[in-house]
UniProtKB/Swiss-Prot annotation:
One of its GO terms (cellular component) is cytosolic large ribosomal subunit. Part of the 50S ribosomal subunit. Transmembrane segments: none annotated. This is Large ribosomal subunit protein uL16. The keyword tRNA-binding applies. It comes from the Bacteria. The lineage of its organism: Bacteria, Bacillati, Actinomycetota, Actinomycetes, Micrococcales. Keywords: Ribonucleoprotein, Ribosomal protein, RNA-binding, rRNA-binding, tRNA-binding. One of its GO terms (molecular function) is structural constituent of ribosome. HAMAP family: Ribosomal_uL16. The keyword Ribosomal protein applies. It holds the Pfam family Ribosomal_L16. Binds 23S rRNA and is also seen to make contacts with the A and possibly P site tRNAs. GO terms for biological process: translation.
Length: 139
């Protein structure tokens, strides 16, 4: 699972979901990618499930890059607890995703295999995403 080794503060405010992504909107490493169409949160478990779905489908060929990292803690109070008495304990680590962000990249496989691997990964994600390929001949 992806979690930070150490953080400056144990608990944070909830991240805002407004606006489009300013960076990370183009494919940087691979030939194919998954791009977020809508915003939301991705937990470390969802990122790992998508990665496993992709790598199992491409078997031993290809390389996968994860372009996001769950660096924000999300807290939750226990069930049947009265309000007050402080903020709840950290329950999940999340990545705040804005529309247009490239989440995963893939290289070293042909396009039909990449499309199917990405489709399987997209089913594990809680937001709308689309398949993108690298522009032009700048390989």
């Amino acid at each position: 699972m992806l979690i930070p080794r150490r953080t400056k503060h144990r608990k944070q405010h909830h991240p805002r979901r407004t606006g489009a992504a300013s960076g990370g909107t183009t494919i940087a490493f691979g030939d194919y990618g998954i791009q977020a169409v809508e915003g939301g949160y991705l937990t470390n478990r969802q990122i790992e499930a998508a990665r496993i779905a992709m790598t199992r489908h491409i078997k031993r060929g290809g390389k996968v890059w994860i372009n996001i990292y769950p660096d924000r803690p999300l807290t939750k109070k226990p069930a049947e607890t009265r309000m007050g008495s402080g903020k709840g304990s950290v329950e999940w680590w999340i990545a705040n995703i804005k529309p247009g962000r490239v989440l995963f990249e893939l290289a070293g496989v042909d396009e039909p295999l990449a499309r199917e691997a990405m489709r399987r990964a997209q089913h594990k994600l809680p937001m709308k995403t689309r398949f993108v390929r690298r522009e032009g001949g700048d390989q």
